[in-house]
């Protein structure tokens, strides 16, 4: 079995969130804390479903993981809301992960709800996955803790018994080298060299708001190599930096493994472009790629890291500056080489220079040597016009802010020969064989070979014609465009203006333009794909300002897909040509995106192949013609008086005068020749200076155009965001007005329904009150009538009582009379009882009728209430379905409660009547059994029959109302009583 790796990674994958509120002006960030180390995700937009898509990881071994699991160490995730404007940080909530749930197998992510959620109305959740992964890679920077050294360094240091943090470079002044690692084990000699070869586009590092401290400032590159401060030769021209490539090297005693750990700890070399004590820009060269794990290249040949590195201004991050285009980015060519001492090397590094024209005067080709410096101390051993930073001050860094401002980069200095060529050219930097001493400065005699790298291109654009005008008025138009990638930001315009009318095609004069430039093919393709050519249509009017009508967008990448044709160049080399023709619409610049007219164009791209060998030229124009410095010859001696008299023209005096005049004329000619030569030299110098100033102005204009383009892009973006926000605000206001109207209508409708309900309830109450009043009045009348009958019966009873007493007194002694009187009395009582029974029967029938009417009225009210409820339900069916259901339920519940109460009242009344009937029936039985002396069985049977008849009548009466059926409780009770009476009757 393969043993498990001891090195693990605790990986927390934070994928996405949901149920978050939308806060457009805030950002969301999640911070994870474990074992004292804190990691965080990148800020994302504060939307309802934020996308984090971030993995956070901690290095750990199995033993420490086991201890953390025993101690139940949690992983706490905190979610914050950031305000970019005020940098305010609000806590949204937190999540606690249990480390014991982490497994080495891949697990599906889970949703975790935020605890102590700030947004109480939203149940915000985050999708998180917690896993363990085997740490197999040598160095994974994204998984390291912030201050953790590479893992290879840990392993090697543990083998050597040395802490990686204790590995430092110590200067050995006697031996002239730096010792890295223990001296008894690290004895291999190495040479580490840094070469600064070229620099381009340095003027981009100085914005228009910066001012340099001097009128003629001197610039230099500064870096620290093993504690040694190194600066190169200063130069004063940022646009055309002219300095010799210099190599600074140090000798090292170490071993490959210890040196790899040291380079991993000090993995970056910072190079600053300085002016005085200010850092204008810097770049970082990675050193950890020199010695790779398991590589033995250092034993065969030197290992190098070289290339053109982009310089970044120190305040780009603070000011949030926009990125500079690739063709305008400031770069510095640097080569870092590491070799064993005694091995020769040659490294290639690209030299990029600006395009230019050849000088008119004769030039002499010389190869520029590379100056080499050997560093043995903490300071640079050479002297330079620009003093290096003092030992007690730190070197300029990215954070050093400059306090000055610049209007333009114009320097008044002596003319120097400039290096001109086409394209980018690499140079070979060779290193001398012999190693210098402890403090020597040696000039290498090897040369810079410049192999070709870029292609020479010629791009031409022919704006042929415009046609199909859509405007109602004629246009006096010119076309204008610019494309800084071709080497010039100056606009190209057609001239003179041409008049275009409807239904006509007009050919444009002076519309052909060709551009010669050098670049890499992939850079050309990338630029053509990203940046289209924008052609502006302007209307020229003599009475007013020029008016921008529209813009045509020409996609230059179309020519890359066209067919290639082969042709021979001027020197017989093989070249390629691509041609593309098309018509594009010109879209209105303002208002709606309507087409104004169509533009027909033809573009051609010619590839002349790789650029030729470029060498550095040194002008010979400084070798002036030497001035003629002749002294006039002494006049001839006077002739002796003894000589013979001669002709006047033959005399010595005449000849001397003639020679003197001829000498004067010759001197005048020589002086005029010298003046002409000096004038020519001054004119050439003036022309060179003028060209130089023109290039500087063009570069500054290009830079300002790029800055203004960036500002214009920001302004356009801000305007677009503002328009979007205005549209969102307008739509939100419209939605608010609509919702307000709907709420107002809903409120009015609900108020009207409430008023209708109140009115109906009031009418129902009034009707019920009137009905109760009528019932009360009728009951009062019945009461008075019954009271009158009771009084009459009482009076009649008293009269009969008196008569009976008198008759009784008279018939006390007569049995027949007494019996007769008793019979009569009983007969009267019988009649009275029959009358009472009839009255009670009538009262019962009347009560049954009243009860039936009440039940019918109840059924009618119930039916009417149901009909009104159905009408309301139909009216509110679409909007208030749930309210209708609740209302119906409450209504039915109230109706059932009312019916139950009425049934309870009816049941109580029935019980009362039943009790009354039973009492009457009992009285009748007692009267019949006691006074008449009739048989007990016949009376009981008649009572049961009457009771049975009464029960059957009550049941039938209730069934006829239509309110009750056989399943109701009262009907079931009546049926039960009827069965009991029938049973008793059959038994008797």
Curated annotation (Swiss-Prot):
It is found in: Cytoplasm, Cytoskeleton, Microtubule organizing center, Centrosome. Keywords: Coiled coil, Cytoplasm, Cytoskeleton, Phosphoprotein, Repeat. Residues 706-929 form a coiled coil. The keyword Repeat applies. Ubiquitous. Highly expressed in brain, lung and kidney and weakly expressed in heart, liver, small intestine and limb (at protein level). Expressed in brain. Residues 384-394 have a biased composition (Pro residues). The keyword Iron does not apply. GO terms for cellular component: centriole; centrosome; cytoplasm. Residues 1-112, 435-569 form the C2 domain. CDD domains: C2 (cd00030). Residues 354-425, 624-644 are annotated as: Disordered. Plays a role in the microtubule-dependent coupling of the nucleus and the centrosome. Involved in the processes that regulate centrosome-mediated interkinetic nuclear migration (INM) of neural progenitors and for proper positioning of neurons during brain development. Also implicated in the migration and selfrenewal of neural progenitors. Required for centriole duplication and maturation during mitosis and subsequent ciliogenesis. Required for the recruitment of CEP295 to the proximal end of new-born centrioles at the centriolar microtubule wall during early S phase in a PLK4-dependent manner. Interacts with TACC2, TACC3, CCDC52, TALPID3. This is Centrosomal protein of 120 kDa. It comes from Mus musculus (Mouse).
């Amino acid at each position: 079995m393969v043993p498990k790796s001891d090195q693990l990674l605790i990986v927390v994958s934070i994928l996405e969130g949901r149920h978050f509120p939308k806060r457009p002006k805030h950002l969301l960030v999640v911070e994870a804390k474990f074992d004292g180390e804190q990691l965080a995700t990148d800020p994302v937009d504060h939307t309802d479903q934020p996308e984090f898509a971030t993995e956070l990881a901690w290095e750990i071994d199995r033993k420490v993981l086991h201890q953390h699991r025993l101690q139940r160490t949690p992983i706490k995730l905190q979610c914050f809301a950031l305000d970019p404007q005020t940098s305010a940080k609000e806590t949204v909530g937190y999540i606690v992960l249990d480390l014991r749930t982490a497994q080495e197998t891949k697990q599906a992510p889970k949703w975790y709800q935020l605890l102590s959620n700030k947004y109480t109305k939203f149940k915000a959740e985050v999708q998180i996955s917690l896993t363990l992964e085997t740490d197999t890679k040598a160095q994974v920077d994204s998984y390291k803790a912030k201050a953790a050294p590479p893992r290879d360094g840990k392993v090697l240091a543990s083998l050597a018994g040395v802490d990686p943090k204790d590995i430092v470079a110590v200067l050995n002044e006697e031996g002239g080298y730096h010792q890295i690692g223990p001296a008894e084990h690290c004895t291999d000699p190495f040479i580490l060299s840094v070469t600064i070869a070229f620099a381009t586009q340095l003027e981009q590092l100085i914005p228009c708001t910066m001012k340099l401290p001097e009128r003629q400032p001197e610039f230099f590159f500064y870096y620290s190599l093993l504690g040694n401060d190194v600066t190169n030769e200063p130069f004063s021209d940022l646009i055309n930096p002219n300095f010799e490539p210099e190599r600074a090297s140090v000798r090292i005693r170490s071993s490959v493994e210890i040196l790899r750990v040291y380079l991993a700890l000090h993995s970056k070399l910072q190079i600053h472009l300085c002016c005085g004590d200010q850092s204008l820009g810097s770049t970082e060269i990675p050193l950890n790629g020199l010695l790779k794990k398991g590589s033995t290249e250092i034993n065969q040949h030197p290992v190098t890291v070289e290339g053109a590195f982009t310089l970044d201004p120190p305040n780009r991050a603070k000011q949030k500056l926009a990125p500079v285009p690739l063709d305008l980015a400031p770069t510095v060519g640097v080569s870092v080489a590491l070799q064993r001492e005694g091995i020769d090397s040659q490294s290639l590094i690209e030299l990029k220079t600006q395009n230019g024209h050849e000088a008119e005067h004769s030039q002499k080709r010389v190869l520029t040597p590379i100056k080499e410096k050997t560093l043995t101390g903490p300071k640079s051993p050479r002297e330079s016009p620009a003093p290096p930073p003092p030992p007690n001050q730190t070197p300029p860094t990215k954070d050093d802010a400059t306090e000055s401002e610049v209007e333009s980069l114009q320097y008044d200095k002596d003319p120097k020969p400039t290096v001109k060529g086409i394209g980018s050219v690499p140079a070979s930097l060779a290193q001398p064989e012999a190693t210098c001493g402890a403090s020597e400065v040696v000039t290498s005699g090897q040369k810079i070979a410049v192999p070709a790298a870029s292609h020479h291109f010629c791009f031409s654009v022919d704006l042929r014609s415009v046609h199909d005008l859509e405007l109602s008025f004629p246009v006096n138009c010119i076309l204008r465009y610019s494309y800084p990638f071709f080497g010039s930001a100056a606009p190209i315009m057609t001239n003179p203006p041409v008049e275009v009318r409807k239904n006509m095609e007009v050919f444009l004069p002076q519309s052909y333009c060709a551009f010669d430039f050098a670049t890499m093919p992939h850079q050309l393709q990338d630029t053509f794909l990203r940046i289209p050519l924008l052609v502006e249509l302007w209307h020229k009017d003599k009475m007013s300002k020029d008016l921008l009508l529209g813009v045509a967008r020409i996609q230059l990448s179309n020519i890359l897909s066209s067919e290639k044709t082969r042709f021979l160049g001027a020197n017989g080399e093989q070249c390629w040509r691509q041609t593309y023709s098309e018509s594009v619409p010109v879209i209105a610049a303002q208002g709606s995106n309507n087409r104004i007219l169509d533009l027909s164009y033809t573009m051609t791209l010619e590839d002349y192949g790789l650029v030729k060998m470029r060498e550095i030229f040194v002008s010979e124009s400084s070798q002036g013609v030497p001035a003629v410095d002749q002294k006039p010859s002494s006049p001839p001696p006077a002739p002796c008086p003894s000589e013979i008299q001669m002709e006047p023209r033959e005399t010595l005096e005449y000849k001397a005068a003639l020679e003197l005049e001829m000498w004067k004329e010759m001197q005048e000619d020589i002086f005029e020749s010298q003046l002409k030569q000096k004038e020519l030299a001054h004119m050439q110098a003036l022309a060179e200076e003028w060209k130089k100033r023109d290039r500087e102005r063009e570069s500054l204009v290009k830079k300002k155009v790029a800055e203004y383009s960036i500002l214009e892009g920001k302004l356009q973006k801000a305007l677009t965001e503002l328009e979007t926000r205005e549209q969102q605000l307008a739509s939100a206001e419209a939605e608010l007005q609509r919702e307000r109207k709907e709420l107002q209508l809903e409120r009015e409708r609900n108020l009207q329904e409430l008023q209708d309900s109140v009115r109906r309830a009031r009418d129902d109450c009034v009707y019920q009150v009137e009905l109760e009043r009528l019932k009360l009045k009728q009951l009062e009348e019945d009461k008075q009538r019954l009271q009158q009958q009771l009084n009459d019966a009482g009076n009649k009873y008293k009269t009969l009582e008196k008569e009976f007493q008198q008759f009784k007194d008279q018939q006390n002694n007569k049995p027949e009379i007494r019996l007769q009187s008793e019979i009569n009395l009983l007969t009267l009582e019988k009649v009275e009882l029959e009358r009472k029974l009839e009255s009670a029967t009538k009262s019962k029938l009347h009560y049954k009728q009243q009860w039936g009417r009440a039940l019918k009225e109840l059924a009618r009210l119930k039916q009417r209430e149901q009909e009104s409820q159905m009408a309301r339900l139909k009216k509110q069916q679409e909007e208030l379905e749930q309210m209708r259901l609740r209302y119906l339920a409450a209504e039915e519940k109230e109706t059932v409660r009312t019916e139950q109460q009425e049934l309870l009242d009816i049941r109580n009344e029935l019980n009362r009547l039943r009790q009354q009937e039973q009492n009457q029936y009992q009285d009748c039985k007692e009267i019949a059994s006691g006074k008449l002396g009739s048989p007990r069985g016949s009376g009981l049977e008649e009572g049961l029959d009457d009771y049975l008849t009464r029960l059957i009548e009550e049941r039938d009466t209730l069934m006829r109302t239509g309110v009750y059926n056989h399943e109701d409780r009262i009907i079931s009770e009546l049926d039960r009583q009827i069965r009991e009476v029938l049973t008793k009757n059959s038994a008797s």
